[in-house]
Curated annotation (Swiss-Prot):
This is Maturase K. Belongs to the intron maturase 2 family. MatK subfamily. Pfam families: Intron_maturas2, MatK_N. It comes from the Eukaryota. Keywords: Chloroplast, mRNA processing, Plastid, RNA-binding, tRNA processing. Usually encoded in the trnK tRNA gene intron. Probably assists in splicing its own and other chloroplast group II introns. GO terms for biological process: mRNA processing; RNA splicing; tRNA processing. GO terms for cellular component: chloroplast. It is found in: Plastid, Chloroplast.
Length: 505
């Protein structure tokens, strides 16, 4: 990272913002390979990087040599005899360079992110990254709101929009041309499929580059919330991250202020209610408001028009659902969340008169949807479609302890992620399915019956599926007759990604 930062701080980069020369450096491809598709380029020092046979130094050197010798990327269609850069082993070379390019475009933002964290002294940055940190926010805010909107952020209708979005952040024209080449290369090779499937295919082949492009696209779509929030509050809000500090961003805000202030004086009034909250994970977002149905419909109208006019995105009406919180449950991050009205009867006595008061209290509830979760288990071959446990095929060379540990780890991960559920009955059923599926798998391996195997294994099978929170729950909460441990919710601040089995979307 010191070597990268040294290049970025030289006069040539500061004056011209050139990123493409980094494509000719071998360590870029080592970073792209060794840190994986989901890794961070800031997690390990340079000396810890290594190579394997597939991404050897010799292959990278040959690739760099071809880039030095090649004068252009795009080969003429009429000249079929040319063996240019993409003429020989095109897919492999394109994938390698796109992986390296993904690392390069992340560098300026990563350095700004590190500097902003050091300046703000954010010590609990990893806690704020946790998915579970969203649900305490829901508990605190949603019980006071009236309406909720489920929003699916639309995909860009053309890949050129992604390039135009990055023009505000990256002022290196050759790098933008190279990005445009990659996008059109994958688009042309999959021209017979829809744009959404094309983007999905692109994400599977070059996940790191796609995630960077998609996050930049989503951030642009969300820029309207930042602007409206700043206009509706006297205190200027400070957003986390380095994406706000980009070229022309504040210029755009000032321009929008002038336009809305002069031409649409009543528009900002619609958004001055401070009780509007917005939460997003991946491509799905939740917009909740305390206002009336009219206000939330105005939000929908302005969002659709903003996306269509500013980003040329066609947002279908069924991608934004408007519902009342008291009558609607929304699915988000593997939980089915809702706001329930719980009545509380209080007896009051004044002098000789006594009367009962029925008070309705709003409470935020989160439950685990059992049907989608059973569908995920059935897809992974732990049970059939009706939830009946079946034996899962494993390699014959695996020992009993390895099979037992794998089942136990899956069960603990699911229980760990869904520990915030208000009702634990669904989790008990999932654990029963996994436990019996494990017993069927082991009994099938030993050609025995499930009853005999469970009798022989005994408490060892039960302890393997017992989670840590169940072991310490009795120490945290007192044992009283009114205590109901199946309703206690526990949120963890170390979960930064959703479990594959828990993600039913």
């Amino acid at each position: 990272m010191e070597e990268l930062q040294g290049y970025l701080e030289i006069d040539g980069f500061r004056q011209h913002h050139f990123l493409y020369p980094l494509l000719l450096q071998e360590y870029i491809y080592a970073l792209a390979h060794d840190h994986g598709l989901n890794g961070s380029i800031l997690s390990e020092p340079m000396e810890n990087l290594s190579h394997d046979n597939k991404s050897s130094s010799l292959i990278v050197k040959r690739l760099i040599t071809r880039m030095h010798q090649q004068n252009h990327f795009i080969i003429s269609v009429n000249d079929s005899n040319q063996k240019g850069f993409v003429g020989h082993n095109k897919n492999f070379h394109s994938q390698k360079i796109s992986e390296g390019f993904a690392v390069i475009v992340e560098i300026p933002f990563s350095l700004q992110l590190v500097s902003s964290l050091e300046e703000k002294e954010i010590a609990k940055f990893h806690n704020s990254r946790s998915i579970h940190s969203i649900f305490p926010f829901f508990e605190d805010k949603l019980s006071h709101l009236n309406h909720v909107s489920d929003i699916l952020i639309p995909y860009p209708i053309h890949l050129e929009i992604l390039v135009q979005t990055l023009r505000c952040w990256i002022q290196d024209a050759p790098s933008l041309h190279l990005l445009r080449f990659f996008l059109h290369e994958y688009w042309n090779s999959n021209s017979l499929i829809t744009p959404k499937k094309s983007i999905s295919f692109f994400s599977k082949e070059n996940q790191r580059l796609f995630l960077f492009l998609y996050n930049s696209h989503v951030y642009e779509c969300e820029s309207v919330f930042i602007f409206l929030r700043k206009q509706s509050s006297h205190l200027r809000s400070t957003s986390f991250g380095s994406f706000l500090e980009r070229t022309h961003f504040y210029g755009k805000i000032e321009h929008l202020v002038v336009v809305l202030g002069n031409d649409f004086p009543k528009t900002l009034w619609l958004f001055k209610d401070p009780f509007v909250h917005y939460v997003r994970y991946q491509g799905k977002s939740i917009l909740a408001s305390r206002g009336t149905q009219f206000l939330i419909k105005k939000w929908k109208y302005h969002l659709v028009n903003f996306w269509q006019c500013h980003f040329y995105l066609w947002s279908q009406p069924d991608r934004i659902h408007l519902n009342q919180l008291c009558n609607h449950s929304f699915y988000f991050l593997g939980y089915l969340s809702s706001v329930q009205l719980n009545s509380s009867v209080v007896r009051s006595q004044m002098l000789e008169n006594a009367f009962l008061m029925d008070t309705a209290i709003k409470k935020f509830e989160t439950i685990v949807p059992i049907i989608p979760l059973i569908g995920s288990l059935a897809k992974a071959k732990f049970c059939n479609g009706s939830g009946h446990p079946i034996s899962k095929p494993f390699r014959t060379d695996l020992s009993d302890s390895e099979i037992l540990n794998r089942f136990g780890r899956i069960c603990k991960n699911l229980s760990h992620y869904h520990s915030g559920s208000s009702k634990k009955q669904s989790l008990y059923r999932i654990k029963f399915i996994l436990r019996l599926s494990c017993a069927r798998t082991l009994s099938r391996k030993h050609k025995s019956t499930v009853r005999a195997f469970l009798k022989r294994l005994g408490s060892e099978l039960l302890e393997e599926f017992l989670t840590e929170e169940e072991q310490v729950l009795s120490l945290i909460f007192p044992r009283t007759p009114s205590h109901r441990p199946h309703r206690e919710r526990i949120w963890y601040l170390d979960i930064i990604c959703i479990n594959d089995l828990a993600n039913h979307e």
